[in-house]
Amino acid sequence: MTTETLDKPIKSAGYFTDGVAIVDPAVAAAMTRELEREQYQIELIASENIVSRAVLEAQGSVFTNKYAEGYPGRRYYQGCAPSDEVEQLAIDRAKQLFDCGYANVQPHSGAQANGAVMLALTKPGATILGMSLDAGGHLTHGAPPAMSGKWFNAVQYGVRADDHLVDFDQVEALAREHRPALIIAGGSAYPRTLDFARFRAIADDVGALLMVDMAHFAGLVAGGAHPSPMQYAHVVTTTTHKTLRGPRGGMILTNDEAIAKRINSAVFPGLQGGPLMHVIAAKAVAFGEALRPEFKDYAKATIANAQALANRLKARGADIVAGGTDTHLALIDLRPLGITGRDADEALERSAITCNKNGVPFDPLPPVKTSGIRVGSPAGTTRGFGIAEFEAIGDMVADVLDALRDKGEHGDADVEADVRGRVRALCERFPIYQG
């Protein structure tokens, strides 16, 4: 086999100058379609938000090129001084934001953060106690299909049938019966505030550690609009997007130095290799934004808007799980209307409103169908919608749901077209990413 000697440097024309529109028109076209979707659809998915241009710029920065295994000042690669600077900024801002002693900003996601806590503080086969999916919990809290449900003896608690609030009598009974190593508070579709003090008392009673997953409401805590779990939990996990308005990623917080050391070892080298420095840079930017006074206004408005949306839907005849919301999300039980979550979220998307089908407490339908939808206010609040706009959105959603009730699973094309027009007009009044 002959090897030809190359006497010229290898460099692709345009490699450092051409943008994606030139290099890959197919991807560029998809990016354009996604931008238009975000600009002209109303986003009600409670776990989604709209980041600032500054966060986008940081995430698309040259930090994507850098490997930085380890932690600030203790890296396994050279050339990490700028990475140290930006990660330390993220850590310090997170500690200030949540008034805590230790922060690990390296988890790639909320699921990775939860997995790292379990790796650090439990062993495979240990008992964990978390909220069941149908009560509003999350996959990573011990659901059977997830790693947490396969590698651990996962026991699940639920909510009361009469008011859909956490059944603390059940939590206490299960904790005393099973003696879990870890109790998990938090969820992905629970609209009320959690009694962190009660969870901690139960954990202390059985010698368990308490983990609070505040992925959904972290931004509300940061903005002072929601109680903080930091004084009660041994460890707190969160995502950095959702109500926190940062890039998609995870984070772990604690006030316990010994736990912090175990968490750091569990994240790296236990669960992950190199951190995503471009994402950590974007986290630092988002945390800096959340430290500004106006973020407190955002957090308060997010809750007020969610309540306005839930109240309008309730006035239009919808059944609101737990009677309303204290947070950024509401869960709508569609069984009184005789329609499914799948039919509802598909009809709403045809109407230029995105939400997600979601199980409701004691749901008889499978997760691919569900008896409910979950709606949220974070993205709409970010683009400037207020109470009046969310009340109007409530009417739009109710019009589509009423059409499904009256016309069947395919809905009413005329109603959906009318709502699309109203959505477009509203979005044009509150533009995003212009120029």
From Swiss-Prot:
Instruction: Give each disulfide bond as a residue pair.
Output: none
For this entry, list what GO says about its biological process. glycine biosynthetic process from serine; tetrahydrofolate interconversion
Keyword list, A-Z: Amino-acid biosynthesis, Cytoplasm, One-carbon metabolism, Pyridoxal phosphate, Transferase
Bilayer-crossing residues are: none
**GO molecular function terms attached to this record:** glycine hydroxymethyltransferase activity; pyridoxal phosphate binding
Q: Which cofactor does it need?
A: pyridoxal 5'-phosphate
Keyword Protein transport, does the record have it?
Answer: no
UniProt-listed Enzyme Commission number(s): 2.1.2.1
Q: Cross-referenced NCBIfam families, in alphabetical order?
A: PRK00011.1 (NF000586)
Protein name (Swiss-Prot/TrEMBL): Serine hydroxymethyltransferase
Name the species this protein comes from. Sphingopyxis alaskensis (strain DSM 13593 / LMG 18877 / RB2256)
